[in-house]
Amino acid sequence: MLLELSEEHKEHLAFLPQVDSAVVAEFGRIAVEFLRRGANPKIYEGAARKLNVSSDTVQHGVEGLTYLLTESSKLMISELDFQDSVFVLGFSEELNKLLLQLYLDNRKEIRTILSELAPSLPSYHNLEWRLDVQLASRSLRQQIKPAVTIKLHLNQNGDHNTKVLQTDPATLLHLVQQLEQALEEMKTNHCRRVVRNIK
């Protein structure tokens, strides 16, 4: 699977052939630090002074390299596919090898960082439900609508919490139909490809 880069990312990476290979390696280290701790403008300014370029140019170069490494790591691109993806950029063979080495050295760490950054969503534990219907009343003249009360038990990071929801049967039926439609859509080839690429 080849990584497709937008024109903007190609422009950001176009700065790399203009600098020494040691600088590109340092940019790779800064890119991994960027993932761990976030952006640090002082590092960009210091590198920009040494290279006699604007700090925006350095920042764009690091961000382009960060995108290249994170997307490649996220998709678990093979060595050959990574080389083919970078070859399109028109870099020298030495720079392509250096980028490949950066990718191979850091892909496990980048995947670990990305998994830590992913939001922790609650997961289903148990469900209780009750149908509430008023059987008789002298004062009500309109039709009585039943209500479905749902008690949803969830787990999140080892903590158990409970959500109580109430709805009418028509809305619940519509919700069930939408969920069944979504599950059917997950069986399509397009969705399978998307899910495979997310992992």
Swiss-Prot record:
Keyword Transcription on entry: yes
Keyword terms: Cytoplasm, Transcription, Transcription regulation, Ubl conjugation pathway
Entry GO CC: cytoplasm
Tissue note: Ubiquitous.
Subcellular location: Cytoplasm
Domain COMM: 123-190
A Pfam short name: COMM_domain
Keyword presence, Transport: no
Annotated function: Scaffold protein in the commander complex that is essential for endosomal recycling of transmembrane cargos; the commander complex is composed of the CCC subcomplex and the retriever subcomplex. May modulate activity of cullin-RING E3 ubiquitin ligase (CRL) complexes. May down-regulate activation of NF-kappa-B.
Membership in a protein family: Belongs to the COMM domain-containing protein 2 family.
Subunit structure: Component of the commander complex consisting of the CCC subcomplex and the retriever subcomplex. Component of the CCC (COMMD/CCDC22/CCDC93) subcomplex consisting of COMMD1, COMMD2, COMMD3, COMMD4, COMMD5, COMMD6, COMMD7, COMMD8, COMMD9, COMMD10, CCDC22 and CCDC93; within the complex forms a heterodimer with COMMD3. Interacts with RELA, RELB, NFKB1/p105, NFKB2/p100. Interacts with CCDC22, CCDC93, SCNN1B, CUL3, CUL4B, CUL5, CUL7.
UniProt protein name: COMM domain-containing protein 2
